[in-house]
Swiss-Prot record:
UniProt-listed PANTHER family: CYTIDYLATE KINASE/PANTOATE-BETA-ALANINE LIGASE, PANTOATE--BETA-ALANINE LIGASE
Anything else known: The reaction proceeds by a bi uni uni bi ping pong mechanism.
Binding site for (R)-pantoate: Q61, Q153
Binding-site positions, beta-alanine: Q61
Organism: Caldicellulosiruptor saccharolyticus (strain ATCC 43494 / DSM 8903 / Tp8T 6331)
Alphabetized GO MF terms: ATP binding; pantoate-beta-alanine ligase activity
Active site: H37 (proton donor)
Protein name: Pantothenate synthetase
Record keywords, A-Z: ATP-binding, Cytoplasm, Ligase, Nucleotide-binding, Pantothenate biosynthesis
């Protein structure tokens, strides 16, 4: 496995691989790898000749009072995990390398960023879209792999790829969960023991909504209320949002029909966690 820190070096490597007719799968990450990330690597390896992973904690997708400085980082650990999974190249640039002093461009996907995490974290998805477009231009992948856990991020990236005619196939991958249902996340490391127990309520609330829908409930405000009641029974919880949106358009809905994404963000202590499920009626 080769670690590459410079953009021009990564681009040269990619040019050579493309000349040899190799297909490239790309797994963009912010590091502190967990089983969710590794499942993306396995998927990439099964579909491409070469797998490139980026590890870059992207400062421009964090708000002023968010956790950029304390976001967990352990490059040695990540490198070992990536190597063990058979990643071919790790692109590990510095902030200066990605954003030199004269950097002036922002990529902004409208409308689908007005709700959910886009509303709670203004500017977040501009930061995501900008870094992902930059990474796509550096790595020039045939396919790129994203977890369904960040459902809104996935929608934003799909929209950007479509609108800007990018030659990359976006491959969504299922959420990987702990045994008790908690969606795997690098931010789970922030939770205390008691908070960790409370955190299972996100998935329980999503499943409660799913069960109620299966029993015939279609009214979104009633479903939200049931989820809120369950979540707020737990200690340490504060709801950021619960949203029901059409899976394809990302439009908020008031009645459950067709394919629906149910997504939520909940603070457990000071840690903001997200999760979602898809239901079809």
């Amino acid at each position: 496995m080769v670690v590459v820190g410079k953009i021009h070096e990564m681009k040269d490597i990619v040019k050579k691989l493309k000349k040899e007719g190799k297909t490239i799968g790309f797994v963009p990450t912010m590091g502190y790898l967990h089983e969710g990330h590794l499942s993306l690597v396995r998927k990439s390896k099964s579909q491409n000749d070469i797998t490139i992973m980026s590890i870059f904690v992207n400062p421009i997708q964090f708000g002023p009072n968010e956790d950029y400085d304390r976001y967990p980082r352990d490059f040695e650990r990540d490198k070992n995990l990536a190597e063990k999974e058979g990643v071919d190249y790790v692109f590990y640039p510095s902030v200066k390398e990605m954003y030199p002093d004269d950097f002036k461009t922002v990529v902004s996907v409208k409308k689908i960023t007005d709700i959910m995490c886009g509303k709670s974290r203004p500017g977040h998805f501009d930061g995501v879209a900008t870094v992902v477009l930059k990474l796509f231009n550096i790595v020039n992948p045939d396919r790129a792999y994203f977890g369904q856990k960040d459902a809104q991020q996935l929608a934003v990236i799909k929209q950007m790829v479509k609108d800007l005619n990018l030659d990359v196939e976006i491959v969504p991958c299922p959420i990987v969960r702990e045994e008790d249902g908690l969606a795997m996340s690098s931010r789970n490391t922030y939770l205390s023991g008691d908070e960790r127990k409370s955190a299972t309520v996100l998935y329980r609330a999503l499943n409660l909504a799913k069960d109620l829908i299966e029993k015939g409930e279609r009214n979104v405000s009633k479903l939200k209320k049931a989820m809120e009641d369950l979540i707020l029974k737990e200690k340490y919880t504060k709801i950021d949002y619960i949203e029901f949106v059409n899976y394809d358009t990302f439009e908020p809905i008031s009645k459950v029909e067709g394919k629906v994404l149910i997504a939520l963000a909940v603070f457990v202590g000071t840690t903001r966690l997200i999760d979602n499920i898809v239901v079809e009626v």
